[in-house]
Design a protein with these regions (language model features):
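Short terminal hydrophobic/aromatic SLiMs and anchors at protein ends
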Residues: 3-7, 19-21, 26-27
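Hydrophobic alpha-helical
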Residues: 213-245, 258
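Periplasmic-binding protein-like
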Residues: 112-117, 166-167, 222-230
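Intrinsic-disorder-associated, low-complexity terminal segments enriched in Asp/Asn/His/Tyr and depleted
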Residues: 15, 294-297
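Glycine/small-residue-rich loop that forms an oxyanion/phosphate-binding "nest" at active or ligand-binding sites
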Residues: 106-107, 112-141
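C-terminal functional extensions of proteins
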Residues: 252-290
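N-terminal glycine-rich anion-binding loop in soluble enzyme alpha/beta folds
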Residues: 26, 32-101, 168-206
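Conserved beta-alpha
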Residues: 136-140, 144-199, 278
């Protein structure tokens, strides 16, 4: 009407979490309606992996890197004990009563599989001890499928048809020897081994040290695969580099644990250029010197019977 002034909507200030934005055209109610996402029908249903880890486990974020978007990890830890990394600690964090309590707590979120994320804790009792751990966890979790890191290692070696393996560990000599015995019990020959002698703060080991140890352990032509032990040792980003350099599959504790757990759910772990997870990555390109050597061998052998 003549003589009347139409007023613009009162400015609305929206806090985005980064800065405050002045929105003069929308009221708060209108802004909320514009952001309505209920029609999407989310959130996306999640499938769960229950993870039991030692009290000093520090690499939760690394575990998640192998997990597809539709899967959640539900972690719990064993009770603290004032013992450094050793065979004694391995026995303490793998006691069946401790595992049972952890699995019963995790069962509240209805996981599809239980994973025990500790290498030494699952190889300290040998193959029979590892199987007993799985039985104890499944028994506490209403018959849920259960895996351990050491059991997953043997499963991965079988998947890749590996009979000779080199080992890298952050452990002391006594813990490392126990791993060697476990692998040998499964009929796998250990061709080389490097260990760091650490008893604490293993998660702080830099990638460069892991790579250096791998180069020392995996002698050219001696091993069919390399295994980097300990779920507290960072490995995700070095696996493709080491596989390209050593030209053999490189397995790590966290990798095989997630691979085996997700396999029981009928889904695949995520890991670009990792031979265990991607069959295409197992076809190593032929290097020029290898091609020449093969040609020389054929020429030398012509005419022989």
């Amino acid at each position: 009407m003549h003589g009347l002034t139409t007023l613009a909507p009162e400015p609305t200030f929206v806090n985005t979490g980064v800065s405050t934005i002045r929105c003069p055209l929308f009221s708060q109610r209108e802004a909320g309606a514009a952001m309505d996402v209920s029609f999407l029908g989310g959130p996306r249903p999640q499938r769960g992996v229950a993870v039991v880890a030692p009290f000093d486990f520090a690499l939760d974020r690394e575990l998640w890197r192998w997990v597809p978007d539709e899967v959640s990890l539900h972690l719990t830890r064993t009770p603290f004990v004032p013992v450094e990394v050793s065979l004694d600690l391995a026995r303490l964090v793998s006691e069946h009563e401790t595992l049972g309590e952890a699995v019963r707590a995790l069962s509240a979120v209805a996981p599809e599989v239980v994973a025990y994320a500790c290498t030494s804790g699952s190889f300290v009792g040998g193959i029979a001890g590892e199987r007993a751990m799985c039985a104890a966890m499944s028994g506490a979790g209403d018959a849920l499928p259960s895996v351990t890191t050491s059991g997953a290692l043997l499963e991965a070696l079988e998947e890749l048809r590996i009979r000779r393996v080199a080992l890298v560990t952050p452990y002391t000599v006594s813990v490392t020897r126990a791993l060697e015995r476990y692998v040998a019990e499964a009929g796998i020959r250990v061709t080389g081994c490097s260990f760091m002698g650490l008893t604490r703060r293993i998660w702080q080991v830099p990638y460069r040290d892991v790579v250096a140890m791998a180069r020392r352990a995996a002698r050219p032509g001696a091993a069919d695969a390399l295994f980097i032990s300990c779920t507290n040792l960072p490995t995700y980003d070095v696996i493709p580099q080491l596989e390209a350099e050593l030209r053999i599959p490189v397995l790590s504790a966290n990798q095989v644990t997630m691979w085996a757990a997700l396999r029981r759910m009928g889904t695949r772990a995520v890991g670009p250029y990792q031979a265990l997870l991607d069959e295409a990555a197992r076809a190593w390109p032929v290097l020029p010197e290898e091609a020449q050597g093969h040609q020389d061998h054929q020429e030398h052998g012509e005419g022989l019977t």
